[in-house]
Amino acid sequence: ASALTRSHVADFLVESGVCVNRKKVFKRYLNKGGKAHVPAEWCSMSTAIGAIKGAGGIAILAHPGRYPLNRAKLKRLVDTFRQVGGEALEASYPNIAPEMKQYLEKLGVEFSMYLSCGSDFHDAAATWTDVGKLPALSSEVAAQVVWQHPVWKARVDAI
């Protein structure tokens, strides 16, 4: 099963000739202030984590360095995420500043969390990211990489 997303709507509007490209669709219609913008309804952090873990997944805080938070607030977010059952932190992704990557790795160590990395790929039409193009995690955190998590290892062993 698949879900209809804003990207599908953008593609439809481009294909229909309403806009010349996706960027214009998002700016004019889908982003905040746009004619067709619908605010997201978010569940609580603990509800999301429960759903992820209930489905057999690993709850990972995605690209936390991109949130508009100072370091004290970011640390509080990571602490709260961990307290409500989050297990991992994405510490590397495209265009991350080296200092932020190092800080996220430090937070992962401090809070005894697994660390992940990802190219933040959303769909093939996205031009702002390339699959797999991101800085590697530091060798100092090799024992904490998410693929060392028991859930991950069990899935790999089952293949």
Residue locations for each model-derived region?
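Extended, charge-rich helix/loop segments that form flexible
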Residues: 1-28
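Short, mixed-charge, low-aromatic patches
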Residues: 2-7, 36-38, 58-63, 102
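Non-catalytic alpha-helical scaffold/packing segments enriched in small hydrophobic residues
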Residues: 8, 12, 44-51, 76-77
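Short acidic/polar alpha-helix capping motifs at helix-coil junctions
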Residues: 10-16, 40-44, 66-72
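Charged catalytic cores and adjacent phosphate/nucleic-acid-binding surfaces used
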Residues: 20, 49-61, 65-159
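Surface-exposed cleft-lining segments at the edges of enzyme active sites
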Residues: 27-39, 91
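A mid-sequence, solvent-exposed acidic-amphipathic segment
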Residues: 35-56
